[in-house]
Amino acid sequence: MKPVTIYSTSVCHFCNMAKEFFKKHNIAYTEYNVGTDPERRKEMVDLTGQLGVPVIRVGDEIVVGFREDVVSHMLGLSTS
């Protein structure tokens, strides 16, 4: 499986939804809290050009925000 990374903050509702989705589907992921880690925040801005969270990276694909259908497709999960 491609590596999964989420750039998030502790108070972001959609970040929490994404992390619950990963747990539900047993998807291992690396989390960076951009609210407390300025280096990772800069990395996120360099990748996306903006500060909105969550930013989810699956391999080389990046999506800003959390839409279950989009992330499922990125992960190759069945949506049925």
Predicted regions located by residue number:
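Glycine-/small-residue-rich active-site loops that bind phosphorylated ligands and cofactors
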Residues: 13, 36, 63
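A short, hydrophobic beta-strand/beta-hairpin element that forms part of a small beta-sheet core
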Residues: 54-63
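Extracytoplasmic thiol/disulfide redox context detector
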Residues: 1-5, 75, 80
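Residue-level detector of anion-binding/catalytic polar loops
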Residues: 28
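Ser/Thr-centric signal marking residues that sit
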Residues: 5-9, 48, 53
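Local sequence-structure signature of Cys/Sec-based thiol-disulfide redox active-site neighborhoods
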Residues: 1-25
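Short, flexible helix/strand-to-coil boundary loops that buttress conserved ligand/catalytic motifs
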Residues: 19, 67, 75
